[in-house]
Amino acid sequence: MKTVGELELSGKRVFIRVDFNVPLDKEFRVKDDLRIRAVLPTLNKVIEKGGKAILASHLGRPKGKPSAEFSLKPVGEHLSRLIDRPVPLAPDCTGREVVERIAQMKNGDVLLLENLRFHAEEEKNDEAFSRALADLADVYVNDAFAVSHRAHASVHGMTRFARECAAGYQLENEIKYFRKAMDNPARPMAMVIGGAKVSTKIGVLEHLISRVDFLVIGGAMANTFFKAQGKEVGRSLVEDDHLETAARLLKAAAEKGVKVYLPVDAVVAPSLESCGDVQQVPVEKVPKDRLILDVGSKSIEVFESVLKNCRTIVWNGPLGAFETPPFNKGTFALAEFLGSLDALTVIGGGDSAAAVKQANMEDKVSYVSTGGGAFLEMLEGITLPGVAALEECCGRS
């Protein structure tokens, strides 16, 4: 697959599919710019080579029609401050006005198209819409790993009509680190998996059991495994319809010689709001009127004793309700510990990435993925539609 640095870009219109689907506060200011900063190497390379950078993204779920709430205007303003140059916002992502704006661009200019999802055709992967987007540019670049699991027009459809295609540096890095961690990992290898539900990660667990040496399970999903083992979990979140699944996964791991580590103690409280009535108890002694909201300190010690000898570690999903102190201690302790290791540490998007950032460990781990759903699908062994389409386009161009 070609990368953007290999192309001759001077004077060319370069359509860069980015993922600027970032959280905004009540004043419509960017709260977390990880995904914006992730595209800067690609954008700066296009500017440096004299290309005309046309940025395209979605934001939120505007349901196929324009909405001021989902305008990319605040994102463009934030990007402008990051690169210290104007980033004007086009009135739309296709149409006569957009074509005219692009025609006026000079080498090194940047233009941000308005929200792709203001058009229902984007998510429908509509052929005419895909062609209209492709007609805006001479070169198509995908630098949006986080949406590459979606067969949408700007990710999949327009590659069929693009004159030339390439991967951006962020997409290239995502694939490189993922393959380094999963295809031929330095061993021992561990997967740390957390979050709320077993049901959302069954495919991941099934795929990984034959590939890892150690599996560390935390978060609310551990409750389902506890109950499958006959343990009391109080009023904790449990997926009762997946108890057999949890038992089957534990049995499969044992048959393949994969050591599974579940928490040995838990932080419990009557509710998320009851921060003053918090206890740490062994997992065998969870009170019937309490919720498990985090792993305990002994669990962290056990997890660290396993992970310290691993050479490859992939982490996806928090160990507790980390958005609500004091139930963030387990997740933050893990983030800090992974940042201290001399191992390949790949953090898989979403809440895990947010936790690593909040713990100031972004620069200490090997790689923090920008993808949530895309990362999970790759963990399941699924080929991402956007990546497959890009590889096919690169092969033609």
Swiss-Prot record:
It comes from the Bacteria. This is Phosphoglycerate kinase. GO terms for molecular function: ADP binding; ATP binding; phosphoglycerate kinase activity. It comes from Syntrophobacter fumaroxidans (strain DSM 10017 / MPOB). It is an enzyme of class 2 (transferase). Substrate binds at residues 19-21, 35, 58-61, 117, 150. It catalyses: (2R)-3-phosphoglycerate + ATP = (2R)-3-phospho-glyceroyl phosphate + ADP. The keyword Ribosomal protein does not apply. Belongs to the phosphoglycerate kinase family. Keywords: ATP-binding, Cytoplasm, Glycolysis, Kinase, Nucleotide-binding, Transferase. Coiled coil: none annotated. The keyword ATP-binding applies. Disulfide bonds: none annotated. Its main location: cytoplasm. GO terms for biological process: gluconeogenesis; glycolytic process. Monomer. It is found in: Cytoplasm. Pathway: Carbohydrate degradation; glycolysis; pyruvate from D-glyceraldehyde 3-phosphate: step 2/5. Its EC number is 2.7.2.3. Gene3D superfamilies: Phosphoglycerate kinase, N-terminal domain. SUPFAM superfamilies: Phosphoglycerate kinase. The gene is pgk. PROSITE patterns: PGLYCERATE_KINASE.
